[in-house]
């Protein structure tokens, strides 16, 4: 089967590089599936999982926003933060989730609720990817 080169890159460096058969990601416009030979496009990404299919295996990468650039022979994901499922520290993600939930429940005026909501979404996404809840 044909493959497409995929790179997931953050400001800290590359997170994932491989040839895959299909890339699925959650864009702001909805779920995207990219196969080899796809028309060129750029799409802003939501916080979510990028699914990378190779044969019968699917690898997951948690991304916290960014952009997906598609060319016929390559997909590049430029993410603010990204982690492979096996690299996620579950205890740290649970602690971040609990911290964000406490901040949201406190309802104090000095708390940036939008930032706390984003932190909660990122933590839940990391836990879902680590536990393969997709």
From Swiss-Prot:
Keywords: ATP synthesis, Cell membrane, CF(1), Hydrogen ion transport, Ion transport, Membrane, Transport. It comes from the Bacteria. Pfam families: ATP-synt_DE (PF00401), ATP-synt_DE_N (PF02823). One of its GO terms (cellular component) is proton-transporting ATP synthase complex. InterPro entries: ATP_F1_dsu/esu_C_sf (IPR036794), ATP_synth_F1_dsu/esu (IPR001469), ATP_synth_F1_dsu/esu_N (IPR020546), ATP_synth_F1_esu_C (IPR020547), ATPsynth_dsu/esu_N (IPR036771). GO terms for molecular function: ATP binding; proton-transporting ATP synthase activity, rotational mechanism. It is found in: Cell membrane. Its main location: membrane. It is a peripheral membrane protein. CDD domains: F1-ATPase_delta (cd12152). PANTHER family: ATP SYNTHASE DELTA/EPSILON CHAIN, ATP SYNTHASE EPSILON CHAIN, CHLOROPLASTIC. Belongs to the ATPase epsilon chain family. F-type ATPases have 2 components, CF(1) - the catalytic core - and CF(0) - the membrane proton channel. CF(1) has five subunits: alpha(3), beta(3), gamma(1), delta(1), epsilon(1). CF(0) has three main subunits: a, b and c. HAMAP family: ATP_synth_epsil_bac. Produces ATP from ADP in the presence of a proton gradient across the membrane. NCBIfam families: ATP_synt_epsi (TIGR01216), PRK00571.1-3 (NF001846), PRK13446.1 (NF009980). This is ATP synthase epsilon chain. The gene is atpC.
């Amino acid at each position: 089967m044909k493959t497409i080169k995929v790179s997931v890159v953050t400001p800290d460096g590359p997170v994932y590089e491989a040839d895959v058969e299909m890339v699925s990601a959650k864009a702001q416009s909805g779920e995207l599936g990219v196969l080899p030979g796809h028309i060129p496009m750029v799409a802003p990404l939501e916080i979510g999982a990028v699914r990378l299919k190779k044969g019968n295996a699917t690898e997951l990468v948690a991304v916290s926003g960014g952009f997906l650039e598609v060319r016929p022979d390559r997909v590049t994901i430029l993410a603010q933060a990204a982690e492979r499922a096996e690299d996620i520290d579950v205890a740290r993600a649970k602690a971040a989730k609990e911290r964000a939930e406490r901040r949201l429940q406190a309802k104090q005026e000095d708390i940036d609720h939008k930032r706390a909501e984003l932190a909660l979404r990122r933590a839940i996404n990391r836990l879902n990817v680590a536990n393969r809840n997709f």
